[in-house]
Amino acid sequence: MGAWIALNQFKYFKNQIKGFIGIGSAPEFLERLMWKKFPKKVKKEIKLKGISHIKNGDYEYPITYQIIKDGRKNKVFSKKINSKIIVTMFHGQKDEAVPVSFSRKVLSVFTKAKKRMVVIKNGDHSLSNKLSINKILKELDRFRNTIL
């Protein structure tokens, strides 16, 4: 959800934002990865009760109708960001939560940016292994040296 929130910040802070790094980004996931895949029974429950508890692995998550509606009000894929900044997207090739196509779609939102896509071969959604973290830290250094 972090990249989604950050992309929406361009509405207010476009001139202050100097770079963008996304990690396993999933803007609009509420609609595209959840709502569209929910069975009709779950959608009906969410609409009628305002909430449903969705089990995923060992966890249960409350999904409210309000958050689905809020997600619809904050779409970013249909907008363009014309900032001349550096943008790097990191995504794990073995991410089972979010398809790599989401990070590629985020790149397409930036029309004038210097863009880079880094797909980490054995990376999962968290990109929390040592190799992934080192690649991200190296990119942060590059940003710091380029932007500051």
Model-identified regions with their sequence ranges:
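N-terminal glycine-rich phosphate/adenylate-binding segment common to multiple enzyme folds
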Residues: 1-4, 25
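Short glycine-enriched nucleophile-adjacent loop
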Residues: 3-14, 20
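The alpha/beta-hydrolase serine catalytic core
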Residues: 16-88, 92-114, 119, 124-137, ...
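Alpha/beta-hydrolase-fold serine-hydrolase catalytic core, especially in secreted/extracellular enzymes
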Residues: 145-148
